[in-house]
Amino acid sequence: MSHRDEAQHNPPNLIFTYGTLKRGFANHGLLQSLFSTNDAAFLGTYRTAEELPLVCGPHGVPFLLNFPGSGLGRHRVRGELYAVSDHGLTRLDELEGISVGHYERLPIRLLPDGDSSIGGGGGGATVVEAEAYYAHRSFAEDMWRRNGWLGFEVYTEEACKYVRRALRPKNRSFLEDIRLFVSSSS
């Protein structure tokens, strides 16, 4: 079955991106290649319905943390929503290191960006159910602590100083980089 046939039989997967997969960022090329095979489509800019922490880890890699709530360090994170085929989802999962414990893909509730309402009451925006790549639970709490329990609303390369994979040290794994990062002081 071709990817186009697959898309006709399976509903698309809705994926919220908040970091390097966004337009203009280092890993957006993967989504562009998926656009060319009809395995992905841009749906618009959105923000999280719940306040969540978004932080930077080693090499300026962004991590959304699955710690919903309100208060200092949590924001309605802004990003982009994509419809992705099953083939496209497999490619994104590979990039995000799902099988090796870098991220985990979990449900997320979104609102269209620019809508000031929050889900319900008085003509509020329709909440969209999607999935996002969150920091793996094995290190998320340490990542939150290492960032001083402060997150940000939108990922920018200027704030995080992202380092492309090709320019990172080759003598250790990304999980080792994460362990070193969370065990160091700021």
Predicted regions and their residues:
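Glycine-aromatic micro-motifs
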Residues: 2-186
